[in-house]
């Protein structure tokens, strides 16, 4: 009976995972492009929409590289087409409209992940050019209403490229944006190395280390840094002001672990493996309180300050594997 329950849960979860992205091209291959022109796919090709990439780059698309790599590649081909039709990769498209929803530029993660795993059935050079476009700051040539531009091409990307970090007095959610940019830039660096673009590989490898800028050893948290190079004060790791503070749908407790591309570097910042493990343990035993007048409702499923109910925490339990105590991951 227990095995049947586990099986039922697994396949129910798998069904839910495959609900989106969804088919957007008709039976004859016609679809509405990101430029709102009627287009037609190549014969046998399908065009997809509803890429909620802030959600799906973490687990869905890596799962598809294992279970259905060709489907994942077809979705990447749709993303490449969207970048050509609309001028830039979407962060989250809806029926061939840019929404500008959430942060990061995670289409590049899909491309790098698939390419690294040997899936080559897409034009990687087109995908790479689109990745460089997404990581820079250029508001021209994007086919969306003018009021949408700051969401599709946020000013945070300007600061990252111009001064090397996102000042918390210049942009909201600065820490979260910068940490996700560092990961995405690491993905771009991988592609650059693969394609022989040494100059950009070095440039984006340097950007990928940008997470170090935000770590405050005196508190043990990633913190907002203003344009004068000073930590934001006052600081409260339990505080949350939904979509209006230095983090995105989370607080300093949850976001201080978002360095998925360099866990060894994060351990070094936190004082080595033993201190890292103790610090990680403290996340799960901390007081689960949240403070503030506009606490993010997305911070949910709390075990201590680990928020299993929302995306920024989803990778954290796996960090024990990198710290040499994999049984802690299994226990959790």
Locate the predicted segments by residue.
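Fold-level signature of zinc-dependent metallopeptidase catalytic domains
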Residues: 7, 17, 22, 32-48, ...
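Short, small-residue-biased leader/transition segments that mark boundaries at the very start
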Residues: 2-6
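Structured, non-membrane catalytic/scaffold regions adjacent to prosthetic-group chemistry
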Residues: 52-56, 62-75, 82-88, 101-104, ...
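Active-site core of glycosidic bond-cleaving carbohydrate-active enzymes
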Residues: 43-58, 66-67, 108, 118-332
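Active-site-surrounding "flap" and adjacent substrate/cofactor-binding loops of secreted or lumenal enzymes
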Residues: 28-43, 69-94, 288-295
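Structural motif corresponding to the C-terminal cap of alpha-helices
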Residues: 17-25, 42, 83, 87, ...
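Aromatic/His-enriched, Gly/Pro-containing loop or helix-boundary segments
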Residues: 39-50, 89-107
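Carboxylate/His-rich catalytic cores and anion/metal-binding grooves
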Residues: 7-27, 66-79, 104-139, 212
